[in-house]
């Protein structure tokens, strides 16, 4: 298979389509699971190469191959860049898949399965950040952010919107390379068409205000809002906009970024859901006040990323030229970063769940079998006064029957205290101020919740709770977005007309424009 040079589109060649069987791979461990299937770490039996197998779930598809998988494959075969995940090939299972007992898996009795084969990455950003005691240094944060922006700039130049930027979709290997993954919600766009796009994209905590207000014409600026949320999360040590539903998410955005009006965001009052969500009272912008402990250059860049008006939001190209990346401490060389044990969000969630179950079982055991000298109150019948003979001790009173154990909700919160203190320059790497070439996340999407019915059709189901949790960065755990309506190319917004201006950028991004 021909491979395009870095930064160039490869439109003529496609990955191997079903020419090999999944039996060529040995599944080693599940690293993701979600709405669209499972992701496994696997080994190619002939070469011993470690890869990631993303199984495309077919049992719920009545009309053939899932549209999200088709879209992801078509886009990934075009994109070849060191900061974008590589789709290596497509493989199939020849017959119905079977469980460990050899029985056909329910819903797959008469079908085979299709797998997408990706390069394996050791971590996703959320799984890595959630490791106990993890503390990112400032040069490390700059290194990750520069790679994220470089990969996203490449996508936007080639007219691709990612539309699901979040920590679990940013994959990192043990060489420090970061890659964009999960293009299941990605779309091609064109600046000269004003087609309608769905606004039910991007995980809720990272969704920009224009989508929450009902816009169906948008461009690369939607991804840049998500990048701003990731940036603030890395610096702050926890997510910054944690709404439980669309109205609450917009409320949190307005509390931080101020109330939009025609002066600061022309056209906002004409957006479909503006009247449903406009705040009762005006609020001032508080980004600088809320994050005054950030470095000044970091704060300046964050302000430009979290701009309410998408037409004024900074582009990926301009963000790469921000002073933040060119002042001490400089971004470190990815290869200088420490190596960590594999950390995917699916695995860290699973470990926390197992720990909670063990603690719950220990509590239950303690209640059912108290120590021999424990002093538990005696059981009394309803309305029966407690009676005891004078001088008789109560040491051997009958134990209380154990009730049901406490219910523990699934966790999804900030990963503890600030993990990211101001650190020194660890390997201030800056040869010619060049850009760094360049990571899967996992876990189920929490339920979005429903709110009042400003949307057509009444409901307000959206792109799911906390960090979007979700499946793996290979794309298994996307939310249940409804893709209704004709989706053409995007309309207004920051178009793809990015020129490689500025001396800082001329050698940074290869030979693509």
UniProtKB/Swiss-Prot annotation:
EC number(s) stated in the UniProt entry for this protein: 2.7.11.22, 2.7.11.23
Basic and acidic residues bias locations: 336-348
Active site: 164 (proton acceptor)
GO cellular component: cyclin-dependent protein kinase holoenzyme complex; nucleus
Source superkingdom: Eukaryota
Reactions catalysed: L-seryl-[protein] + ATP = O-phospho-L-seryl-[protein] + ADP + H(+); L-threonyl-[protein] + ATP = O-phospho-L-threonyl-[protein] + ADP + H(+); [DNA-directed RNA polymerase] + ATP = phospho-[DNA-directed RNA polymerase] + ADP + H(+)
Molecular-function GO term, any one: cyclin-dependent protein serine/threonine kinase activity
SMART domains the record matches: S_TKc
Keywords annotated in UniProt: ATP-binding, Kinase, Nucleotide-binding, Phosphoprotein, Serine/threonine-protein kinase, Transferase
Region of interest (Disordered), residue spans: 336-513
Pfam families tied to this protein: Pkinase
Compositionally biased spans, kind Polar residues: 497-513
Low complexity: compositionally biased ranges: 417-433
All residue ranges annotated as the Protein kinase domain in the record: 25-325
Binding site for ATP: 31-39, 54
Biological processes, Gene Ontology terms: positive regulation of transcription elongation by RNA polymerase II
Family: Belongs to the protein kinase superfamily. CMGC Ser/Thr protein kinase family. CDC2/CDKX subfamily.
Stated name of the protein: Cyclin-dependent kinase C-2
Organism: Oryza sativa subsp. japonica
